[in-house]
Amino acid sequence: MKKRIGIVGAGTAGLHLGLFLRQHDVDVTVYTDRKPDEYSGLRLLNTVAHHAVTVQREVALDVNEWPSEEFGYFGHYYYVGGSQPMRFYGDLKAPSRAVDYRLYQPMLMRALEARGGKSCYDDVSTEDLEGLSEQYDLLVVCTGKNALGKVFEKQSENSPFEKPQRALCVGLFKGIKEAPIRAVTMSFSPGHGELIEIPTLSFNGMSTALVLENHIGSDLEVLAHTKYDDDPRAFLDLMLEKLRKHHPSVAERIDPAEFDLANSSLDILQGGVVPAFRDGHATLSNGKTIIGLGDVQATVDPVLGQGANMASHAAWILGEEILAHSVYDLRFSEHLERRRQDRVLCATRWTNFILSALSALPPEFLAFLQILSQSREMADEFTDNFNYPERQWDRFSSPERIGQWCNQYAPTIAA
């Protein structure tokens, strides 16, 4: 008998899982409250970059609509402010790519439906889960909407924060000239905030995502509270002023006459994220085990761009485990966690560490930045390992590991 899988949520996790399962003729139904043709009128959903490991999965799923060789980027520029600013660059071994999710998500939804996946357009609440679980061999929850996240118990040891660590201002902009190499820029203004600049394909072609991770109480926090719609010119002037002061390596490429939101006033998000890590399964009152996937298991701040990439990874692993098993109980969830947890948990821990380190600036982290800025080999490793958060956590998980890493690359610094 053909397996039947129910998926609640049509984000990257749910849709990558659905597409994987349809490749293996598994019956899939996705529950979502949005139809594909509704996305174009939505506010910006996020500013997500897909690293090469995720692009490879998209190739395998035959949904690589925008090849990274044409639309992607090839490395990271870094800027560290202070009395002696540091500028340096690191290469990616294979390009990453960012596409406006208002284009990307409906493409995935249409691909899934074209391949025989079913879609049910409706809200799903916690009260619906038990009934849905009876209809499928396995129910997978991929969204925290409507309190669905509370079904999965939060792990306090992996959820150190009770409130947002940054006041976010995120938008898609035009009027920013590309750097000599199409690349992300990661700019750090000590004590004030971080900026991640991401070349991003949107409705009108290539644009620039600016992810401003403003420290709460800093000179930059005002950007998270000033509304574009109240006075667009005043907002843009404030943004330019703050970028020139805190993130000059980006500001110097802006044409003030052209600088604006890329498409419309819907191209901006402001607010904050409370990072959390939850159990990857829950047992309902009817005895059925359900699986949590993507953001509902691991919610991370966007500073390192790990959310969608670890969600896609976990979806692929879950798909393989669904194929390998026929009973989806607590023991199944243990098999799943054994395979997916290292990357998902390391992405969470690494992101949380960086949030804290960029605020507190402990001496071992400052030493890391100094060596990183002078060793191209170290910068290349650090940059490419955005694909592999478990490798990053191997480097950052203790002061001793950071010190050993710095000692490894110190001899590579040019005299």
UniProtKB/Swiss-Prot annotation:
Q: Name one Pfam family in it.
A: Smoa_sbd
Q: Which GO terms describe its biological process?
A: styrene catabolic process
Residue pairs linked by disulfide bridges in the UniProt entry: none
Keyword Hydrolase in record: no
Record keywords: FAD, Flavoprotein, Monooxygenase, Oxidoreductase
Q: What is its EC number?
A: 1.14.14.11
Q: In Gene Ontology terms, what is one molecular function of this protein?
A: oxidoreductase activity, acting on paired donors, with incorporation or reduction of molecular oxygen, reduced flavin or flavoprotein as one donor, and incorporation of one atom of oxygen
| Catalysed reactions, as listed in the record | styrene + FADH2 + O2 = (S)-styrene oxide + FAD + H2O + H(+)
- The top EC class, named as a word, is oxidoreductase
* InterPro entries, A to Z: FAD/NAD-bd_sf, StyA_sbd, StyMonoxStyA
Under which pathway is this protein filed? Aromatic compound metabolism
Give the protein family. Belongs to the StyA family.
Role noted for this protein:
Styrene monooxygenase which catalyzes the first step in the aerobic styrene degradation pathway by enantioselective epoxidation of the vinyl side chain. In a two-component system, StyB reductase utilizes NADH to reduce FAD, which is then transferred to the oxygenase; the electron transfer is proposed to occur via a diffusing flavin.
Q: How does it assemble?
A: Homodimer. A direct interaction with the monooxygenase reductase component StyB seems not to be necessary for the enzymatic activity.
Q: What is this protein called?
A: Styrene monooxygenase StyA
Naturally occurring in which organism (per UniProt): Pseudomonas fluorescens
| Gene name, Swiss-Prot/TrEMBL | styA
